[in-house]
């Protein structure tokens, strides 16, 4: 039986405005911000110092849970802190120590060697050009020299992993890395160049500049081969200004990079749980997961480590030859078995994690108020409209039309996946009418039925909520519906739109 996890109560310092307040070291204090949330300083977290490489003394923190069994092979997680933070800071800002308590694995949290900033490959000229856009309290990145394999932070991390293998009974096929912000960029760098010693890598915030992922022919730059990847994104986050590329663009390139390395050619399986948006890619060589969290700022969610472990790390390992294998993870991927989505001006729809053609592109129609406004108008709502004929196909209903399509009937019970509305026998729509006739009774929709390019169209949101009782949300012109509470996020909307365009 798994050891039970227990949270230790703490006193939240609501007045804190620092990245990493030293007060957290007292073992009593917590801080909560919309990018990072902490736990009380873990009792088993121990600091170590030693020369690992280049005659430089490095600092790291080890967490060995009481549940660790030295008699059996044990996974190792290496967790990399964000810029301006420390190894102990990463330990309190994640749930890795709590997950380790239950699972019995070991976690190591290294410090960056200098300025609390990792040595990273970067476009140095762009960094210098962008100095004026960077806050004065943020130190300049290290200027990269020589090859990535020669960076001290990379070399010392390799040596630290070797040291952990010597000190503890580590399973060499189950070594994983995760990082936050600059630690995510460091994890990505390590995964691309030294990832052969990892089975999986994950990170939150700060995706990698695409110029470091692809060469001038758009071929991937990779020395490590496949490994399972988890990419956590935050809806309100922004990529660093020296990237000189958009947020959506950077995230798409990061997805494309690992999809190509891991042989992920099929559509993702999408699942949205409240504010957590997931896209699961299964590849011939490895898996790739995107998580985008709605209404979240730069950093990492406190349960990010739990999610990474449950859905990814717990189900991947490498054999002695270095080949990646998969077993059942602790939790089954949270894929929506029932879902559909449409996007403004797109002629395709996402239906149950597949794609189908609409008869006409989706468009948005506004509901307005103008009485008593002296000729002005107020928009009271904007809704995604698709052809009634497409509703018939998506929801497996029979379509009848009259008067050159200006009147339409949907007959039979609407159904999507296992959800069926037995109450419905017939729905009649007519151009210009907000009313529809449901089983010979009058009902109002959100807005009137509209003829568009000889197709009668109505609100998809209204139809999904009224007849299938689905949860419907909209973001940036993309509407998503499923059978449980969900809120589509900005980056998930962009991802779906790319497949519907």
Question: For each predicted feature, which ranges?
Answer:
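A domain-start/cap signature at the N-terminus of enzymes
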Residues: 1-76, 149, 153, 178-194, ...
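Serine-hydrolase catalytic machinery in alpha/beta-hydrolase-like enzymes
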Residues: 51-61, 72-173
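Loop/turn elements at helix/coil->beta-strand transitions in domains of secreted/extracellular proteins
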Residues: 57, 72-76, 102-108, 171-176, ...
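Alpha/beta-hydrolase
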Residues: 78-80, 204, 293
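Primarily recognizes the serine-hydrolase "nucleophile elbow" in alpha/beta-hydrolase
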Residues: 165-225
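The feature captures the conserved acid-bearing segment of alpha/beta-hydrolase catalytic domains
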Residues: 199-285
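C-terminal catalytic histidine-bearing segment of alpha/beta-hydrolase fold enzymes
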Residues: 230-232, 248-249, 259-337
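Primary recognition of N-terminal secretory signal peptides and signal-anchoring hydrophobic helices
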Residues: 318-501
